[in-house]
Amino acid sequence: MKIATILPYKENYTYSKAQAAAIWVSDFFKHSRYKKNNFIYGNTKAKDYLTKNYKNIRINNIKSKFSSTTKEYCKNIVRKIIDKNYDIIEIHNRPIIFNLLKKELDSKFILYFHNDPLSMNGSKSKKERLNLLVNLDKIIFVSKWVQDRFFIGLDKKLSNKTEIVYPSIHKSKKILKKQNRIIFVGKLNFSKGYDIFKEAIINILDEFNNWKAYSIGDEERERPKISHKNHHELGFLKHKDVLDFLSKS
């Protein structure tokens, strides 16, 4: 069984910059029975790859206003893998990539949704989501909420091709003394609910002044900002540092 795993080109598969989808892929790959024949494709300028099976796809026009970065990415992927004869191609978080690769590659396709399908090009409309249900071999969601969002306006009886696979962690053998901390981890934007967190955490910190709140993550675009003496923004941290911080919270 030969498997190609395709990440979004913005998903950095490195120790220094990995976020949720890259970490999910890395963790599940390490326990896969097919890992000897599973290769992960993405785009990054860094070299500290999470696993040795990673293959980097170069993109020349990553911020071009005159050409589609996604189309260039897919074109370069096809060039890289067309002769590999993969049995399965897994695509993470980018339904539009499936639509482009399906035309060029003869493999079974699995699409993973890590975020709200209604916010992604290629799955916003009912027609687009029905097309995915018909043409994909499997659709996997990382939570029931993500699955429910996908089926808004659709008959849930069509869910026989879908499945929920939750993220997982190793159970800690040593329980550390906990501190009064509330942690937000992720992109600090509206789509991740950071605006809701902001409203809730200010009320909590006003009422319980012996607690502190921390935001771990970044966002280059316009976003909510929290102003409170007991809230601290730590920026982007490596995955291991995040886990260490959470273990004490």
Where are the regions that the model predicts?
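Glycosyltransferase donor-sugar binding loop
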Residues: 185, 198, 211-227
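Short beta-strand->alpha-helix junction loop in the catalytic core
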Residues: 117, 145-146, 164-173, 220-221
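A short, active-site helix/loop in glycosyltransferases that binds the activated sugar's phosphate group
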Residues: 122, 129-161
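Short alpha-helical donor nucleotide-sugar binding micro-motif in glycosyltransferases
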Residues: 244-249
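Nucleotide-activated donor-binding/catalytic signature segment of Leloir-type glycosyltransferases, i.e.
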Residues: 222-243
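Short His-centered aromatic/hydrophobic patch
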Residues: 91-97, 113
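N-terminal strand-loop element at the rim of the active site
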Residues: 7-15, 27-68, 219
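Conserved donor-binding/catalytic core segment of Leloir-type glycosyltransferases
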Residues: 4-6, 140, 173-192, 198-202, ...
